[in-house]
Amino acid sequence: MAEEEGPPVELRQRKKPKSSENKESAKEEKISDIPIPERAPKHVLFQRFAKIFIGCLAAVTSGMMYALYLSAYHERKFWFSNRQELEREITFQGDSAIYYSYYKDMLKAPSFERGVYELTHNNKTVSLKTINAVQQMSLYPELIASILYQATGSNEIIEPVYFYIGIVFGLQGIYVTALFVTSWLMSGTWLAGMLTVAWFVINRVDTTRIEYSIPLRENWALPYFACQIAALTGYLKSNLNTYGERFCYLLMSASTYTFMMMWEYSHYLLFLQAISLFLLDTFSVEQSDKVYEVYKIYIFSLFLGYLLQFENPALLVSPLLSLVAALMLAKCLQLNVKKGSFVAKIIKVINFYLVCTLTITLNIIMKMFVPHKENGHMLKFLEVKFGLNMTKNFTMNWLLCQESLQAPSQDFFLRLTQSSLLPFYILVLIICFLSMLQVIFRRINGKSLKETVTLEDGRIGERPEIIYHVIHTILLGSLAMVIEGLKYIWIPYVCMLAAFGVCSPELWMTLFKWLRLRTVHPILLALILSMAVPTIIGLSLWKEFFPRLMTELMELQEFYDPDTVELMTWIKRQAPVAAVFAGSPQLMGAIKLCTGWMVTSLPLYNDDDLLKRNENIYQIYSKRSAEDIYKILTSYKANYLIVEDAICNEVGPMRGCRVKDLLDIANGHMVCEEGDKLTYSKYGRFCHEVKINYSPYVNYFTRVYWNRSYFVYKINTVISFQS
């Protein structure tokens, strides 16, 4: 039957080459789907079902076990079950304390609507400032958590803090499951998923910050990004049926939008993803229709996010929107020419140039007409980071000194090498990248790709999902080599790509094709290696790292900070309810969470006004006069000043990166570069001088509380000068 129907199909192709391709592929899918029950033996169907069932069970189990591991480790580290509420809250440091404090505020609100209104018109957090906390701090996770806590009746079963961290740990389990599924989809075996999870957990110092800062936005957002990438991987596969394609598209749409709502920097990651898809389409490796369907998801998510994020201008001026709009315009201007011809190659180059030019032009136009203040400090930081500008600005230099914003250290590469992750990742990346280049050159020369690539072909670079991941991981890795904090986005996909490679017979077959192996049957050897290599890696990881993981769970650690507990207790008992506190932003976040009192600054770095406040408040550790400090504090209506001994007497490993050094540089009290003049301040360091209790400091400030770590001063409203 198939042979008799062959010639008419070819005639139809000649008459209607465009429409018939889709029809023929659809027919082939239907034909391949229908006969399976008739031709495939029952034991083959059972094997397929068992493989899928075991893989799904392993993926879900891996996610659940990881979530339980995080919960147990957190309990051992902070001993939550034996702590009072105040001691538990102190474990939330910096910006994490701010996020959790708003979760508490939502639970205390008389109704959900009232709670949302108070957050969107918040004037009880920062003095002299009304902020839309939901928009500015992306508090949608806290809104959702508070709804779930009250709607499910969990307030009668579990404490709010356990419910909150339980949701985050559950999301981390979903994160691991999504990575498992992605590696499984790419390699065809769930063994790759198991190896991905093993590498992820072993290298968790470099894969996640969940152990140190639970409420961080990335801990809420990245699990959805992992789900989006898993769906995109399935969507790009060429052998996916119609129902699978629809499911992947719907999952990708939902996860993309959720990811964008959870994290203010999500559109930058999606921008890198869009670049990867653009390059995939440029080299004609994937059907343009599929790629442009993904672009539609970006546009839908951006505009829906813009509306639901209180008309957030950052989304309108984002490079993602400019790039997608440029790609859509370029598609409208594209000409239909014969693929592989010289004219087609020229048009490809012109199209690439057109997209780049339109992206930059549209972004400039949007920034001209859309008022925005978002991420201006980020551009300044990048200029200083890459040496395009020099500055003595305290905030910029302080950011440069942060470990997460510096280049990766040697210890980072050593850890990845010891776990065998880095060597196998480099091997897999090189093979996939070279195979991808072969495909690109083949397309440039006008050669068409095979509709179905078999194992014997040894062409792993012809698979669109593989090429996408290669491009994406190269982009992420390049950025992570400059800013170490981006490793938490890159390394999880390093685990996934390395595990896929060593478990993929196609990758080994591609390597054997290049080596022209003839002594042993290459297909048989590829199948053996795809099972043996991950098994050997897994056994070695089990032997070396499993005892360490068990030891961590057995050790009972203790987070002990009595000085901070005493400070918070004193504030709650002695300070007036309307008091405003000034101090380091990190401490102010803890005060906001533990006491609810108003503060002058917050540990947030996405607002220019807050950054300026932080710099001004930090002047209490500089060589400024008592009068200058008094004027700064009273300008923010502060009533109490808290001096931290750890900052005032800081002995940092890097001279020039201590807070007091950065302040001296900004104020011109220290040599910064050759040629700079050293100016001497006639005043001592304020944080030292104010402790001595002599005039004029006692005229402006009265010490009301102190312990080993903190000194609290009341800012006098009536100044009495003493001789």
Curated annotation (Swiss-Prot):
What subcellular compartments does it reside in? Answer: Membrane
Residues modified as N-acetylalanine: A2
* Alphabetical UniProt keywords: Acetylation, Glycosyltransferase, Membrane, Transferase, Transmembrane, Transmembrane helix
Record's signal peptide = none
Query: How is it placed in the membrane, per its record?
Result: Multi-pass membrane protein
- Which segments show compositional bias classed as Basic and acidic residues? 18-32
Cystine links in this protein are: none
GO MF terms listed in the record are: mannosyltransferase activity
CDD domains in UniProt: Dpy19L4
Say yes or no: keyword 4Fe-4S present. no
Parts of the chain that traverse the membrane? 52-72, 161-178, 184-202, 222-240, 260-280, 292-310, 316-337, 349-370, 421-441, 466-486, 489-509, 522-542
Q: What does this protein do?
A: Probable C-mannosyltransferase that mediates C-mannosylation of tryptophan residues on target proteins.
Q: Which family does it belong to?
A: Belongs to the dpy-19 family.
Tell me which PANTHER family the record gives.
C-MANNOSYLTRANSFERASE DPY19L4-RELATED, DPY-19-LIKE 1, LIKE (H. SAPIENS)
Protein name per the record: Probable C-mannosyltransferase DPY19L4
Q: Which source organism does the UniProt entry give?
A: Homo sapiens (Human)
